[in-house]
């Protein structure tokens, strides 16, 4: 069974586990940014946030099977609107993918966002990650707009679904 736990940047173990997740799935960063994962990805995971958002609006989580962290996520509260929670990243180690963990993690995030009082979940998927696009669509997310960002190798597709 998948469990969710908050992570902190101050924890050496949390930082090491997040880096391990990135390094165990180098294809993800390669697909969406055209480079290899690095320690800067850990910094971005813990501190990256949209302009105008406070650090207090960002929460980072680890997903665990037993004592092993198998994935991580970050969620921004009240972004881009007051009734919405934004999933900045939902990511699992390659060896732990295709086991239902993504669906379970999304259900945990959905329940948390509902408890926080939000009505919608949004995220940005990158067109050069077809597996990710398929996952989000399978989970009921629909495209609401497309844009570009020089950081990413493909088109940025903003997706949304209601919180149920």
What are these regions (language model features)?
Residues 100:
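Glycine-rich phosphate-binding loop
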Residues 83, 119, 155:
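Residue-level signal for beta-strand positions within conserved beta-sheet cores that form or flank
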Residues 2-88, 92-97, 106-108, 112, ...:
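Acetyl-CoA-dependent GNAT
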Residues 41, 132, 155:
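Short Asp/Glu-rich motifs
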Residues 122-126, 137-158:
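Conserved catalytic-core motifs of GNAT/GCN5-like acyltransferases
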